[in-house]
Amino acid sequence: GRFHYGRRGSPTQWALAEALTELEPGADGTMLYPSGTAALAGALMSVLEPGDVLLVQDNVYEPTRSIGSSLLRRWGVETRFFDPEDFEAYAGMFDDRVKAVMLEVPGSLTMEVCDVPRLAGIAKEHGATVLIDNTWATGLGFPALEHGCDITITSLTKHAGGHSDLLMGCASAGKAHYAKLRHTAQLLGQYVSPDDAA
């Protein structure tokens, strides 16, 4: 069952995750994390292995850049940054090692809006998983899973909390990727307090 061990989820954690899944069109499940940055790291770690290449939009949230250029690099994952407006150059970056693309809309620092369906479509042509930091728009403003993304990540600190009384993040995905998110989170002990989820 779902309640056989605390780190596997409590009634409040499951209730929040299920509510967030309902707000994310196309999602089969949502994982909760202790922060938005933890959600970013956990999601990326669920789809990447040593030797892989990650393509990252060049105007993403600074911690996302750092996860790619430091943490993932130490694990043998190469990160390459791209201009989301230069589709030809972006398409030219793909090779057999590129396994994932990290998008963000709008860009955290610049509020630039990119053509997510087009970028995701190019990634899909090359068999890459598409992740998006959808914190500003959320699934209510931009249903990313319906526009070609595989995993959508949100900092709940900003929207679910917003009053400096909650620190949390989430990642939502379809069935196959949700299973990977859940497995990786369990191995890393990435969970939130049942009280915070209430």
What kind of region is each of these model predictions?
Residues 1-38, 64, 68-70:
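Conserved N-terminal alpha-helix of the aminotransferase class I/II PLP-enzyme fold
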Residues 29-198:
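Conserved PLP-enzyme active-site core in the AAT-like
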